[in-house]
């Protein structure tokens, strides 16, 4: 028999205790953003360079840091003392500027920073390649240093040189990624625009050691930036795609070329020159976090399987005269174990033969990979 309505009791079910993702407030306090003294001090830095000073001050205060280590690439070191003065003035921390050469985010040297007593580190000008949770014992902040450019001139230049409907791949360094995204959005109504991505890098960002492979239908790759180091990376990865460079400083647009045949011939010659070598030198890079022990161990196992002996050396940078002192390495065959795919192009300007990991793998297996992408990932961390 069904219960009468007077005997029914309505029970409200409890909401399940499901915790959502933890949210951390990332809003910079108004008292920092509107600090007139701080804003006046920031004017000592170039207006078109975003050093994220407000965020830095907030993060240093939030962490209650006592000593802040600043790491900048050579092109930004001229601003280091100004930034250090601002941090010391508006926080309770003192600062130190790290003097070792910094080629990229793989050079993040949290080990040295900790040894110098720093409990907070700011790395400028590069992507977050080393995760902030990997730097144990020290707080980490990456500042990309976004640089504002004349985007209108860049767009006018591309529209003048390429007819509508063309397929264009846009790439740059991290400093110009924001400008690249703005340009991509403006060009899409008239062009097929591709902003390629190589994770964990940002869309459109390339490194001297890492670039994406593009589809064959891409008519041209446009590099926004100065110099050729990063540009050559994507040219090596895409030998059949015409490459152009727009220099945002000089506003010069140029067609760029790379001698792929000479590069491959050099690689083949280096491989053949080592066929009779019995003892090899393996260098583990100690500049920041460039050296990869897993790659080193992998190469050692490969050499052992071939019955080759080796000498292991730790170096922050390669100095040919120092390597010449180690005469027990046959034919001076050295392998530099670091995260730099460009080392797959052997050095020919010095008497010592220095190889990258990719080229050594080819040498100790077979010649089939001669034309392979020179900066492919061989061994993960």
UniProtKB/Swiss-Prot annotation:
The keyword Iron-sulfur applies. Its EC number is 2.5.1.108. Its main location: nucleus. One of its GO terms (molecular function) is 2-(3-amino-3-carboxypropyl)histidine synthase activity. Its cofactor is [4Fe-4S] cluster. The keyword Transferase applies. Binds 1 [4Fe-4S] cluster per subunit. The cluster is coordinated with 3 cysteines and an exchangeable S-adenosyl-L-methionine. Keywords: Cytoplasm, Iron, Iron-sulfur, Metal-binding, Nucleus, S-adenosyl-L-methionine, Transferase. It is an enzyme of class 2 (transferase). Component of the 2-(3-amino-3-carboxypropyl)histidine synthase complex composed of dph1, dph2, dph3 and a NADH-dependent reductase. Catalyzes the first step of diphthamide biosynthesis, a post-translational modification of histidine which occurs in elongation factor 2. Dph1 and dph2 transfer a 3-amino-3-carboxypropyl (ACP) group from S-adenosyl-L-methionine (SAM) to a histidine residue, the reaction is assisted by a reduction system comprising dph3 and a NADH-dependent reductase. Belongs to the DPH1/DPH2 family. DPH1 subfamily. This is 2-(3-amino-3-carboxypropyl)histidine synthase subunit 1.
């Amino acid at each position: 028999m069904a219960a009468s309505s007077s005997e029914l009791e309505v029970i409200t079910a409890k909401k399940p205790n499901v915790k959502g993702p933890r949210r951390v407030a990332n809003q910079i306090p108004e008292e920092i953003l509107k600090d007139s003294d701080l804003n006046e001090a920031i004017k000592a830095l170039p207006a078109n360079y975003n050093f994220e000073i407000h965020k830095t001050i907030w993060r240093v205060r939030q962490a209650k840091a006592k000593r802040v280590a600043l790491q900048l690439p050579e092109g930004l070191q001229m601003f280091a003392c100004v930034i250090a003065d601002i941090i010391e003035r508006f926080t309770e921390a003192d600062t130190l500027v790290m003097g070792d050469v910094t080629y990229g985010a793989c050079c993040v040297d949290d080990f040295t920073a900790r040894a110098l007593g720093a409990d907070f580190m700011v790395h400028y000008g590069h992507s977050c390649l080393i995760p902030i949770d990997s730097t144990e014992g020290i707080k980490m902040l990456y500042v990309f240093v976004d640089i504002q450019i004349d985007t209108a001139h860049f767009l006018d230049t591309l529209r003048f040189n390429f007819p509508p409907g063309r397929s264009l791949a846009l790439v740059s360094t991290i400093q110009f990624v924001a400008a690249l995204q703005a340009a991509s959005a403006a060009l899409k109504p008239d062009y097929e625009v591709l902003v390629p991505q190589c994770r964990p890098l940002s869309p459109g960002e390339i490194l001297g050691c890492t670039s994406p492979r593009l589809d064959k239908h891409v008519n041209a790759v446009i590099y926004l930036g100065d110099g050729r180091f990063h540009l050559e990376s994507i040219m090596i990865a895409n030998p059949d795609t015409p490459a152009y460079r727009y220099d945002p400083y000089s506003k010069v647009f140029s067609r760029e070329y790379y001698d792929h045949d000479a590069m491959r011939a050099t690689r083949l010659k280096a491989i053949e020159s080592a066929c009779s070598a019995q003892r090899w030198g393996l260098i583990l890079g100690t500049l920041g976090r460039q050296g990869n022990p897993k790659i080193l161990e992998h190469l050692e196992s490969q050499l052992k399987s071939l019955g080759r002996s080796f000498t292991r050396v730790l170096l922050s940078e390669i100095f040919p005269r120092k390597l010449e002192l180690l005469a027990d390495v046959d034919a001076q065959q050295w392998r530099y174990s670091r995260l730099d795919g460009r080392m797959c192009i052997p050095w020919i300007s010095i008497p010592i033969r220095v190889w990258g990991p990719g080229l050594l793998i080819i040498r100790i297996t077979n010649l089939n990979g001669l034309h392979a992408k020179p900066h492919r990932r061989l061994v993960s961390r």
